[in-house]
Amino acid sequence: MKFVLKRDSKLEPFDQERITTAIWKAAKACGGTDKTQAKRVSDEVMAELQKTYGDDGVPTVEEIQDIVEKRLIENGHAQTAKAYILYRK
């Protein structure tokens, strides 16, 4: 993926680090201290995005966020998922 479709319908370069940072901020809000967990979940999100969209697909911000929430919950990070959901509103 090279781009992401923002809420204002603009295309922006895709940057996995933004996903990792958002997960890490949510984790820290819940007392998290291990950024490697945020990176691991971010890598899982990337794998799912790659599988779904391939190299040329363009996911929306909302689609990415939905996958992040799902992966956080699947990995037992329900509190972080809740903080992430509250952050995205």
Regions found by a protein language model. Give the residues of each.
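Long, C-terminal-biased catalytic regions of enzyme "large/alpha" subunits
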Residues: 1-89
